[in-house]
UniProtKB/Swiss-Prot annotation:
Signal peptide: none annotated. The active site is at D9. Mg(2+) binds at D9, D11, D177, D181. It comes from Nitrosopumilus maritimus (strain SCM1). This is Phosphoglycolate phosphatase. Substrate binds at K154. Its cofactor is Mg(2+).
Length: 231
């Protein structure tokens, strides 16, 4: 069996009902992959600590990429910070001073990004930041809006993992559902967009499934079975 590394989003991918509740059958299937000798690494817009804790309790590989690539957690007190929180906070202040309904989302503490409620026009916000010469990334994970440092995304974050653990692109399988997962798709040879993904996201994946979220992960793993059986 050839070892593969699965880079898996959390919200909208292994959750159900939109509230962050884990789809247990999907998690069980991911744990089974680990038991078979593969790696399963969560790559999320949530904090890397949340992703790491899910890996501990869920029985997957104990590494996580969080904050849309801005932070990597390798252990309880071992974090690699790739983003700059202060420049994200500065962007937040600019938006608050120039737009209405810009509100932070109540989330677990972040080390490299700012997380916002999805209560304002994203394109208008990007225009305001550009006019003020603020160079950050403003993205929509469907879970929230995120302000990240320039050059930070799930793809760059996971690339650090690939370098650290000598993982080949040919052995990476990415699974996700939102625009923030597209950079992750680009660093993986195989990528799967779930049924709840937009058409734009689906067009960036090498494979799509019809089922949504956790059910989509189960469908994806069924489709990937021939690849996983390769020697």
């Amino acid at each position: 069996m050839k070892k593969r590394t699965f880079a898996v989003d959390i919200d909208g991918t292994i959750t159900e009902n939109g509230g962050g509740r884990i789809h247990l059958d999907a998690l069980e299937s991911l744990r089974r992959l680990v038991n078979m000798g593969h790696d399963v690494i969560f790559v999320t817009g949530r904090s890397s600590v949340e992703g790491f804790l899910l890996s501990v309790f869920g029985g997957t590989t104990k590494v996580s990429v969080g904050e849309n690539g801005g932070c990597i957690t390798l252990d309880s007190n071992d974090h690699i910070l790739l983003g700059n929180l202060e420049e994200c906070k500065n962007a937040l202040n600019i938006l608050k001073n120039n737009m209405e309904n810009v509100e932070e989302k109540y989330v677990f503490p972040r080390m490299t990004e700012v997380v916002l409620q999805r209560t304002f026009d994203l394109d208008q916000a990007r225009k305001i930041l550009s006019e003020n010469n603020i160079d950050v990334v403003l993205s929509d994970s469907q879970y929230a809006y995120h302000i990240n440092s320039p050059g930070i995304d799930k793809g760059t974050g996971f690339t650090e993992i690939m370098k650290k653990f000598s993982i080949s692109r040919d052995d990476v399988i990415a699974i996700g559902d939102s625009a923030t997962d597209v950079p992750l798709f680009k660093v993986a040879k195989t990528s799967v967009a779930l049924g709840n993904a937009s058409d734009d996201v689906k067009s960036e994946a090498t494979m799509t499934v019809s089922a949504h979220a956790g059910d989509g992960v189960l469908e994806a793993l069924d489709k990937l079975a021939p690849i996983l059986s390769e020697i």
